[in-house]
Amino acid sequence: MNAKLIYLLLVVTTMMLTFDTTQAGDIKCSGTRQCWGPCKKQTTCTNSKCMNGKCKCYGCVG
């Protein structure tokens, strides 16, 4: 019983985290500062990171 509940919580948490991040199109970057502008236009937040040469935007909290 507990194993099923833990597995369900793990799946739900993974799905929530997956849908929280979005790619900022095909914007190439070499540093996180280059992602702030494009991510602010998409998500109204500057929460972003340059990963593998592409911008990744994170949604606002709150």
Swiss-Prot record:
Signal peptide: 1-24
Mutagenesis or variant effect for K49A: Very important decrease in ability to inhibit Kv1.2/KCNA2 potassium channel, and important decrease in ability to inhibit both Kv1.1/KCNA1 and Kv1.3/KCNA3 potassium channels
Residues modified as Valine amide: V61
Effect noted on mutating T43Q: 30-fold decrease in ability to inhibit Kv1.1/KCNA1, and no change in ability to inhibit both Kv1.2/KCNA2 and Kv1.3/KCNA3 potassium channels
Any coiled-coil regions, as ranges: none
Subcellular location: Secreted
Tissue specificity comment: Expressed by the venom gland.
Site (Pharmacophore, responsible of Kv1 potassium channel pore occlusion): K49
Post-translational modification remark: C-terminal amidation is important for activity. There is a 50-70-fold decrease in ability to inhibit Kv1.2/KCNA2 when the toxin is not amidated. This decrease may be explained by a 23-fold slower association rate (k(on)) together with a 2-fold faster dissociation rate (k(off)).
Protein keywords: Amidation, Disulfide bond, Ion channel impairing toxin, Neurotoxin, Potassium channel impairing toxin, Secreted, Signal, Toxin
Keyword Manganese: no
Disulfide-bonded cysteines: C29-C50, C35-C55, C39-C57, C45-C60
Pfam family, one: Toxin_2
Gene Ontology annotations for the cellular component aspect, listed alphabetically: extracellular region
Record-linked InterPro entries: Scorpion_toxin-like_sf (IPR036574), Scorpion_toxinS_K_inh (IPR001947)
Transmembrane intervals: none
Keyword Transcription regulation among record annotations: no
Molecular-function GO term, any one: toxin activity
Miscellaneous note of the record: Negative results: has no effect on hKv1.4/KCNA4, hKv1.5/KCNA5, ether-a-go-go-related gene type 1 (hERG1), and ether-a-go-go-like (hELK2) channels.
Function per UniProt: Reversible blocker of voltage-gated potassium channels with fast binding and unbinding kinetics. Has highest activity on human voltage-gated potassium channel Kv1.2/KCNA2 channels (IC(50)=0.11-0.16 nM), whereas its affinity for other channels tested was in the nanomolar range (hKv1.1/KCNA1, IC(50)=253 nM; hKv1.3/KCNA3, IC(50)=91 nM; and hKCa3.1/KCNN4, IC(50)=70 nM).
Record's comment describing the protein's domains: Has the structural arrangement of an alpha-helix connected to antiparallel beta-sheets by disulfide bonds (CS-alpha/beta).
Family: Belongs to the short scorpion toxin superfamily. Potassium channel inhibitor family. Alpha-KTx 06 subfamily.
Name the record gives this protein: Potassium channel toxin alpha-KTx 6.21
Source species: Urodacus yaschenkoi
